[in-house]
Design a protein with these regions (language model features):
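Accessory C-terminal segments flanking Radical SAM cores
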Residues: 175-248
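Generic structural signal for well-ordered alpha-helices
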Residues: 34, 62, 87, 126, ...
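Aromatic/hydrophobic pocket-lining residues that form the small-molecule binding cavity
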Residues: 30, 58, 83, 122, ...
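Conserved radical SAM core fold
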Residues: 15-16, 52-54, 80-85, 101-117, ...
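Conserved C-terminal portion of the radical SAM core fold
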Residues: 40-46, 67-75, 96-97, 102, ...
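Conserved alpha-helical substructure of the radical SAM core
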Residues: 1-73
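Glycine-rich beta-strand-to-loop/alpha-helix junction loops that act as flexible
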Residues: 47-51, 77-79, 249
Length: 249
């Protein structure tokens, strides 16, 4: 479930299938599952979606994961909806990391892509998290043709992280069963961004086994980092150690 209408994901918004009678996992089921994963040695849980904060019991789930399990890290991926209003709650609940989707730093472009004029709320929310000394902030953007795929757009994101200790990652658009036309029209190979980074002296960085599929780059003149998630690269799935559990279990 998501409350945005991103052109590459849910352009018509979330619509419940009347023929699907399956229910979402309850708080009790999620709590029991979290404890089981903890006993099995899982070291990190990421709450994602859709948009995880649309659940009315989201903060109860987050607090339960932090207080009643031995999972060292609990993080989330969010579209940033009302981030400026919930940033303090996220910090108080013990969230260890946050990934925020921002496909454009241009207000009108962001509104066109998502169906929401909320870029200013997200940026304000990031500032609040930083004031709270929240350290693990990442921004994701889907690489899209004629929207954010030019050196000028890359430079805007670079300026955003120049004095911000934030990881900014581009994600190459993936083809799925129901987006073939959109993919053909909007796909941009990740190589275009990688070439830009190499040309501008960004240096590849290696991470540990739990770091995920992002190829990260650092630069001596920047506090933040750039990253690239390229699902069509040769070794994308080679070290995958993730288990994805759907909202219905």
């Amino acid at each position: 479930v998501c409350n945005y209408k991103c052109s590459y994901c849910l352009p018509q918004g979330y619509k419940k299938n009347p023929g699907d009678m399956r229910s979402f996992m309850s708080f009790e089921e999620i709590s029991r599952l979290t404890k089981a994963l903890s006993e099995l040695g899982v070291c990190k849980i990421r709450l994602t979606g859709g948009e995880p904060t649309v659940r009315k019991d989201f903060f109860d789930i987050l607090k339960d994961m932090k207080q009643n399990s031995n999972i060292p890290k609990v993080t989330m991926t969010t579209n940033g909806y009302q981030l400026n209003k919930i940033a303090n709650q996220l910090h108080e609940a013990g969230l260890d990391g946050i990934n925020i989707s921002i496909d454009s730093l241009n207000r009108e472009t962001f509104k066109k892509l998502t169906g929401h004029d909320r870029l200013h709320e997200i940026l304000e929310g990031i500032k609040i998290l930083q004031k709270l000394n929240f350290k693990n902030i990442k921004v994701n953007a889907v690489l899209l043709k004629d929207i954010n795929d030019t050196p000028e757009e890359f430079e805007k994101f670079g300026n955003f992280i120049k004095n911000n200790k934030i990881d900014f990652r581009f994600i190459e658009l993936m083809q799925t069963g129901d987006n073939l036309d959109y993919f053909k029209k909007n796909h941009v190979a990740s190589k275009i961004f990688k070439d830009y980074l190499e040309k501008n002296k960004w240096i590849p960085q290696t991470y540990g086994k739990d770091a995920g599929p992002s190829l990260n780059f650092i630069h001596t003149d920047y506090k933040g980092k750039f990253g690239l998630i390229a699902p069509y690269s040769k070794n994308f799935c080679q070290t995958c150690n993730r288990l994805r559990i759907t909202s219905r279990g």
